[in-house]
Structure formats: structure tokens, C-alpha cells
């Protein structure tokens, strides 16, 4: 995608065969995490100025009025996977959700659903500090985070997707798959081969 220091052959091939938007920008977020707004915009089909309202509507809780419950149901039924399901698609999700609606209800099949970033890796944040030892290693499984469970989370999500393709191809219906990798987020952990490929 124009970068020369990062090897992205699959993205380059996909971009060359599809449509590229050179001036499509995320205008920000209503929180410190821009990804929250991006995910809500994708799933709700709303631009930034309407996505927060959709998020608030989806979040309405147990003490909601009948009117709020009806608004939530209407918003939920217009989520991207719901629309695709009504259009005859199989729908599948794996990875980072972080949306104010249950993924396992929005999609026909949902696996390994995670919220935001792992927060149990304090060694990976606010580092390195001057005159302090830095024991952090992005590929050391002992720090947990994206290594929680013994495999890198990206490998788990990728395997879910590949496994589902094997299942979906047995069905004549087309399928819609939403795969959301967490790894671009803190604490920025990766297998050693990738750390070695892109030294800092």
C-alpha cells in the first residue's frame, strides 16, 4: 500500500484487484481509542457523527424503557451481519469485538470473542524508562497478553477463519466473514520471526 519497509503481498494483491479510497479518513472518536469508532462505523454503517448515537442505543441496559428497547432492537437488526444474514449469507466473526452488542447474537457463528486490549501485561506499557532495566520481550509468552493461552492471538483468530472457510464452502450460500485482529494494539506483541523481520 505504498510502504517499502513493510512486506504486505496479500494486502497489495487485494488492493490491486479492488477499490481503494485514497481520501477516506476516520475523523476521530468519542473516546481515546479511535478503533472503537471505526468498529462501530463498520458494524452499524454510520459515519462518525452518528456512530456514537448507535453505540449508546445498543448499550441500553436492563432498566431501559419500552421505547429504548424498541430502538435497541431496531438498531441491532440493522447491524451489518444482520443485514447480510437476511440477504442469505452465512455470517461469521472471530477476534476483537468491542461493540455495544453481543457478537454471538449479531453473527450466526462467533468464535473467540475478545473485548479491547489485554490489560494484564503491565511490563509492556510505559517503557523503557531511563536508568531502569527493561525485561520486556514482545515474543516471550510469560508476559501473557496476546500470548495468553500459549499461542499468539493472531494465530488463534487466523485458524478460526481458515476453519470456518472449510465449513462454509460445504454450504451453497455465500458467506460474510468479519475477522478482527487485536495485535496492532498495545502491548504490541508478536512472534519472534516478525520482531526480527522489522527491527526497531
PLM regions and their residue ranges:
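Formylglycine-dependent sulfatase
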Residues: 1-200
